[in-house]
């Protein structure tokens, strides 16, 4: 950690010494409705990139210590037209009038599930411009990598294909993701498979990341974080964009976007087509990803209707297996022992011994691929019932279907419900074969919210939703060297998962005084989950589970001064186990629902060239389902309940306008993530059963105690930006034993990004972008897993997912 803090401070000192101080200004005024003259509390007033405030109960605001180079104030309020006021002509004490939007704004759709400075919760907003700077083909987890407390992972090692995300150490199954307020997480696994939505960032208008329990939302409740995405962006004028990028590992992205603008003063149509492809850093880990986005909107004076459809289709060569520790370290003796322990055949043994230490891929069959298509249909509506009340009603259908194909060497016929083959006097019980494991599902439902704004002290929302997931899981044998009595596409397992989810919530903000406001939020959520049939291990699965949860939240926000605020919140979240928690559990030990009590407290200050915030959190868990470090045969993590555990830490964020040319954004998380008393169960093949090992208090797996992100930008002219992006992630244990021999080592990476914006006569804008990732070629892994057993002694197998060394991406965006 010392080297990263020294490095970041050196950067700051280098650019800061001798730079001139800019003059400071104060701006104050009142925001009102242009027709009624009603003050607008909670309006946002921004001055430049880092400074901003919200109006108090009487619509008044004060901004102090604003640098002299801030040219305008920007005022926004949901349902109103944005106003920009030149600072050169601004008089303190002025009244700024906002006009109601002629059209119901798209932003009201996500307003009920988002938070703001009055909520008392930790959050980060990421706009379309910030995403566009980084978007050269890598997935959304990689684009969000420099937000606080976030760690991204990539199976293929280059940010394309299967990627993952953890926030505060919590994995993707606990991170609630919504698109336009509609749940996106897979209801059974609770995970998010970003590979199914390639280049979705090109259609996103904004992302809000809420850390902790967050506000009540739709779908499986957040149990560590929420990623709230909106695609509904209103374009008044027609537009077209073409983006192409190319880079290392034959990575390329091609995107075409277009929109009609406002037709007949009522209608808009927006569309996008994308292709993303890469050979991957890992051997054979290629991806071929295609997607589209199509949206049609009707904008009336009181009503808004938008139909969205988008789809992603992926063909990805599997790299789920990871690389054995001995291969990563180049330990030949260790590899030979691994080959012997795991019974690798000659082909697989030679692949292990002769592959590059960092690009090894266990799979060699030429069609060992994941093939999946996911189609989304959303009907998003909003109607203004009165000047104070808005009703939003949405409906959605998600259709998913696909399979992954695997070559199996010398597998038992009985594993596929096939009898032995008799040839003469010879009995054949094993065969080489190719199997496909299918998912075929529908996910559909509705969400709603009724939003009330008194334009005085009270703002409130009542909302909720229901949804149903109906998914078939089945496996087929499509080829076998000895086919027994099977027919083509012989089905060897089949089960169905039916999950229903309903929730109802109520939220309110109340402005007690000019300085003090409060937030309250209560939610009731009910879940039923039924699985029937046999799974891919030929185990009969027959369970019917129901859960009812009550999730209250409260928060306070107090304005200490014109420039600073303090806040605190307390939230309770509950969550049901996912599919694998049930199917991988023993009959004696069934998974239980988890409970999280989340305390957040923080401080925000903005003064002149500096913006700073500090957030403390204490996440106290009961029966937390923690990752054991083991994965199943498709790379999904296995979890187990632990009675008592917690995560506590402090998140620091800062932004500094060092001069007109230099800007620095940085964030750091320092945390402790502990299980009160962890017992490890090790399979004992020598004696049967398990050996129990009590480790006492341990660290939670995959939870680094230190995460640091930095973006240092140099802007020599208004059209050119050069940014150094730095990320430090501390040690992560692969399981919950705190064993130093089972961990991912800390790593520090540096990326360099260049952007040059041109405005030729034939185009609105031409953007030339270049990104050099890992410029110092840090040797590191971002993910891994482990498992152990006893067979002639204790054996522990560690696997890692190595990431690429220095690599680059170059792109050109044309806007018309």
Segments from the language model and where they lie:
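Transmembrane beta-barrel wall of Gram-negative outer-membrane proteins
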Residues: 239, 246-277, 282-321, 326-330, ...
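Extracytoplasmic beta-strand/coil segments of soluble accessory domains associated
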Residues: 141-183, 205
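Gram-negative outer-membrane beta-barrel transporters
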Residues: 514, 618-620, 640-736
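Membrane-embedded beta-barrel scaffold of Gram-negative outer-membrane proteins
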Residues: 388-396, 557-559, 565-571, 592-648, ...
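Short acidic/polar hinge/loop motifs at secondary-structure boundaries
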Residues: 62-64, 183-211, 230, 327
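C-terminal beta-signal and adjacent terminal beta-strands/loops
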Residues: 664-667, 672-674, 728-733, 756-816
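A beta-strand signature from Gram-negative outer-membrane beta-barrel systems
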Residues: 96, 198-241, 253
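Short, acidic, small-residue-rich periplasmic hinge/interaction motif at the N-terminus
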Residues: 32-36, 43-46, 74-80, 90-133, ...
């Amino acid at each position: 950690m010392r080297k990263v803090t020294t490095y970041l401070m050196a950067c700051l000192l280098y650019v800061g010494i001798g730079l001139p101080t800019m003059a400071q200004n104060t701006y104050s005024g009142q925001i009102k409705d242009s027709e009624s003259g009603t003050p607008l509390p909670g309006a946002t007033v921004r001055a430049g990139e880092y400074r901003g405030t919200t109006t108090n109960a009487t619509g008044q605001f004060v901004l102090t210590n604003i640098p002299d180079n801030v040219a305008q104030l920007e005022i926004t309020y949901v349902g109103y037209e944005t106003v920009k006021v030149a600072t050169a002509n601004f008089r303190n004490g002025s009244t700024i009038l906002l006009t109601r939007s002629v059209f119901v704004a798209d932003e009201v759709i996500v307003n009920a599930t988002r938070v703001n400075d009055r909520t008392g919760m930790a959050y980060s907003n990421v706009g379309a411009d910030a995403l566009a700077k980084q978007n050269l083909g890598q997935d959304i987890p990689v684009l969000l990598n420099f937000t606080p407390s976030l760690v991204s992972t990539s199976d293929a090692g280059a940010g394309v294909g299967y990627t993952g995300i953890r926030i505060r150490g919590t994995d993707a199954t606990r991170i609630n993701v919504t698109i336009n307020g509609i749940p996106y997480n897979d209801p059974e696994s609770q995970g998010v498979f970003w590979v199914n939505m390639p280049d979705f960032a090109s259609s996103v208008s904004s992302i809000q990341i809420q850390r902790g329990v967050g506000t009540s939302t739709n779908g499986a409740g957040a149990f560590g974080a929420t990623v709230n995405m909106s695609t509904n962006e209103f374009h008044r004028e027609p537009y077209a964009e073409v983006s192409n990028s190319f880079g290392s590992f034959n990575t390329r992205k091609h995107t075409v976007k277009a929109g009609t603008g406002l037709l007949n003063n009522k209608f808009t149509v927006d569309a996008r087509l994308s292709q993303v492809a890469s050979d991957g850093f890992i051997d054979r880990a290629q991806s071929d990803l295609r997607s589209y986005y199509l949206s049609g909107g009707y904008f009336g004076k009181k009503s808004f209707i938008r139909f969205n459809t988008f789809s992603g289709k992926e063909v990805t060569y599997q790299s789920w297996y990871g690389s054995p520790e001995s291969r990563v370290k180049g330990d030949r003796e260790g590899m030979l022992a691994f080959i012997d322990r795991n019974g690798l055949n000659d082909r697989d043994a030679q692949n292990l011994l002769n592959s590059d230490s960092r690009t090894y891929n266990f799979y060699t069959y030429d069609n060992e691929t994941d093939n999946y298509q996911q189609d989304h249909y959303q009907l998003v509506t909003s109607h203004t019932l009165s000047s104070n009340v808005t009703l939003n009603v949405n409906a959605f259908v998600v259709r998913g279907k696909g399979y992954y194909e695997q070559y199996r060497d010398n597998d038992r016929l009985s594993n596929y419900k096939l009898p032995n083959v008799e040839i003469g006097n010879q009995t054949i019980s094993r065969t080489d074969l190719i199997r496909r494991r299918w998912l075929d599902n529908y996910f559909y439902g509705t969400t709603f919210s009724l939003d009330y704004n008194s334009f005085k002290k009270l703002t409130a929302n009542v909302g909720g939703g229901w949804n149903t997931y109906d998914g078939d899981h089945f496996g087929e044998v499509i080829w076998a060297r000895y086919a027994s009595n099977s027919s083509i596409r012989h089905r060897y397992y089949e089960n169905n998962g039916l999950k229903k989810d309903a929730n109802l919530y109520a939220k309110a903000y109340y402005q007690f005084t000019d300085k003090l406001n409060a937030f309250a939020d209560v939610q009731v959520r009910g879940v039923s989950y039924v699985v029937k049939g046999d799974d891919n291990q030929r185990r009969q699965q027959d369970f019917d589970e129901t859960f009812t949860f009550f999730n209250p939240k409260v928060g306070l926000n107090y304005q200490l001064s014109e420039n600073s605020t303090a806040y605190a919140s307390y939230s309770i979240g509950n969550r049901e186990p996912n599919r694998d928690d049930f199917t991988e559990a023993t009959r004696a030990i069934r998974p239980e629902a988890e409970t999280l009590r989340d305390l957040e407290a923080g401080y925000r200050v903005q003064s002149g060239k500096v913006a700073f915030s500090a957030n403390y959190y204490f996440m106290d868990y009961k029966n937390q389902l923690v990752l054991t470090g083991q994965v199943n045969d498709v790379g999904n993590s296995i979890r187990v309940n632990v009675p008592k555990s917690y995560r506590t830490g402090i998140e620091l964020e800062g932004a500094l306008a060092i001069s007109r040319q230099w800007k620095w954004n940085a964030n750091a998380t320092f945390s402790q993530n502990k299980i009160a008393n962890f017992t490890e169960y090790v399979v004992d093949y020598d004696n049967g059963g398990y050996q129990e090992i009590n480790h006492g208090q341990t660290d939670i797996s995959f939870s680094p105690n230190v995460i640091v992100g930095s973006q240092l930008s140099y802007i020599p002219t208004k059209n050119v930006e050069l940014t150094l992006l730095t990320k430090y992630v501390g040690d992560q244990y692969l399981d919950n034993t705190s064993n130093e021999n089972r961990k991912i080592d800390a790593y520090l990476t540096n990326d360099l990004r260049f952007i040059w914006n041109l405005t030729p006569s034939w185009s609105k804008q031409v953007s030339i972008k270049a990104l050099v990732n890992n410029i110092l070629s840090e040797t590191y892994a971002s993910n891994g897993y482990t498992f152990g057993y006893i067979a002639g002694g204790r054996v522990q197998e560690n696997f890692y997912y190595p990431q690429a060394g220095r690599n680059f991406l170059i792109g050109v965006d044309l806007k018309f």
